Amino acid sequence: MIDIEDYGLTEPGKLRAGINLGNVLLVTGKTETGNPSGVSPAIAAAIARNFGFSVSYCTYPSPGAVADAVDGDEWDICLIAEDPKRAETIEFCGAYAEIEATYLVPAGSKLKNI
């Protein structure tokens, strides 16, 4: 196993992942054990496995709440969108997901371009 002190983790062998529950595309529900399920928790678990660690989830209602917890030693990694203000206190890696979104209008709407 990797020396835990090399990574500055609080709990030996455990990766604490900050998870934003506010995006249903990335967190889709809960497992039978009550852990969050979806893309973000799966990626956090895969990262932990890659290092030989277990994972624990620290859940927050919004990405802002995850970011605000950065100084509270509540998580070791978090999975939120990059933002210039957040980058002042959080170091971001490349994107792990891209979400394509669009605007919808009712049939017959005069709005054709936004």
Where are these regions (language model features)?
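Residues embedded in well-ordered beta-strands
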Residues: 16, 102-104
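Ligand-binding "clamshell"
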Residues: 85-99
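Flexible hinge/capping segments at coil-to-helix
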Residues: 96, 105-114
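Extracytoplasmic small-molecule ligand-binding "clamshell" domains
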Residues: 1-81, 86
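A generic local structural motif
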Residues: 2-4, 89-91, 108, 112
